[in-house]
């Protein structure tokens, strides 16, 4: 049985931890609001850009379409770009993305495909290297980046495009966590290359005028598709930041409440043991008095 001093020290230690988790929750809540606004603002732009590409693609013949849109004509080699957080203490956020990526890799391997992986974020690398160390061709860390910007996404996109141009893969899938709410972040896979053509509404595809493209539609696609890849990566990074902050706020809230419950239990044990010790001392005093 722990002594009164040990219990007192444990109570003080848990209280100190509770202060830290409470502060981390407040910081995450403040960052979440900004991250959520950024993620929600990026969605319409990325969706509309994909729709514009789909509309322009209808005016381009397959034999002159950019390779980034048509692909290599094969699907033998798959590149998975897995985006996770740089730090932990955010519940199951990172493990969910890693599990989703792991399942995708296993599925492709079982189908006889060759899989290559690029990890964006330290936690993704730490989780996947245990099983797929030989498949990871590059790790990208954004630990020193205070605020994720478009330039970070553009660098990742350019790296992916250069690998495609070098013939390193046939299909590229971006894996990230789509932010739904503070308690809901859904791991998602988005095909980057060949550029996935989104399904657009009939009202959007019905042409009410004849468009002339200057330069030609194929040249416009050649320029827009790399930009679209950068935009989609940027959106994924923003979604991840919002999801990470939401998961961290929820995790720190749970930790703060658990610390409170532990403090109550330890305080109860401390009071009971102290009362028992006082009772014992009183009995000894009374017994000594009776002996006299």
Swiss-Prot record:
Main location (coarse class): membrane
Highest rank taxon of the organism: Bacteria
InterPro entries to which the protein is assigned, alphabetical: ATP_synth_F1_ATPase_gsu, ATP_synth_F1_gsu, ATP_synth_F1_gsu_CS
A molecular-function term among this protein's GO annotations: ATP binding
Location within or outside the cell: Cell inner membrane
Sorted UniProt keywords: ATP synthesis, Cell inner membrane, Cell membrane, CF(1), Hydrogen ion transport, Ion transport, Membrane, Transport
PROSITE patterns: ATPASE_GAMMA
Topology of the protein relative to the lipid bilayer: Peripheral membrane protein
GO annotation terms (biological process): proton motive force-driven plasma membrane ATP synthesis
Gene Ontology cellular-component terms listed: plasma membrane; proton-transporting ATP synthase complex
Homology family: Belongs to the ATPase gamma chain family.
Subunit structure: F-type ATPases have 2 components, CF(1) - the catalytic core - and CF(0) - the membrane proton channel. CF(1) has five subunits: alpha(3), beta(3), gamma(1), delta(1), epsilon(1). CF(0) has three main subunits: a, b and c.
Biological role: Produces ATP from ADP in the presence of a proton gradient across the membrane. The gamma chain is believed to be important in regulating ATPase activity and the flow of protons through the CF(0) complex.
Listed name of the protein: ATP synthase gamma chain
Taxonomic path: Bacteria, Pseudomonadati, Pseudomonadota, Alphaproteobacteria, Hyphomicrobiales
């Amino acid at each position: 049985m722990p002594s009164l001093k040990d219990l007192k020290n444990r109570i003080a230690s848990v209280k100190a931890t509770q202060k830290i988790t409470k502060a981390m929750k407040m910081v995450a809540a403040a960052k979440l609001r900004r991250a959520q606004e950024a993620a929600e603002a990026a969605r319409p732009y990325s969706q509309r850009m994909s729709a514009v590409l789909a509309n322009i693609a209808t005016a381009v013949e397959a034999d002159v379409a950019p390779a980034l849109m048509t692909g290599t004509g094969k699907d033998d080699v798959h590149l998975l770009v897995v985006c996770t957080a740089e730090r932990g203490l955010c519940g199951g956020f990172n493990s969910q993305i890693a599990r989703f990526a792991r399942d995708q890799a296993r599925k492709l391997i079982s189908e006889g495909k060759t899989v290559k992986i690029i990890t964006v974020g330290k936690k993704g690398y730490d989780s996947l290297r245990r099983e797929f160390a030989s498949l990871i061709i590059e790790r990208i860390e954004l630990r020193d980046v205070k605020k994720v910007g478009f330039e970070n996404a553009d660098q990742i996109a350019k790296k992916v495009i250069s690998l495609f141009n070098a013939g390193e893969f046939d299909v590229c899938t971006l894996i990230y966590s789509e932010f739904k709410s503070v308690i809901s972040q859904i791991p998602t896979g988005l095909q980057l290359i060949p550029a996935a053509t989104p399904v657009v509404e009939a009202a959007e595809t019905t042409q009410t005028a004849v468009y002339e493209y200057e330069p030609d539609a194929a040249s416009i696609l050649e320029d827009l598709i790399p930009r679209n890849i950068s935009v989609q990566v940027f959106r994924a990074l923003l979604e991840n930041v919002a999801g990470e902050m939401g998961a961290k706020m929820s995790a720190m809230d749970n930790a703060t409440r658990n610390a409170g419950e532990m403090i109550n239990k330890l305080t109860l044990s401390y009071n009971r043991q102290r009362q028992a010790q006082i009772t014992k001392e009183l009995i000894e005093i009374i017994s000594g008095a009776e002996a006299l």
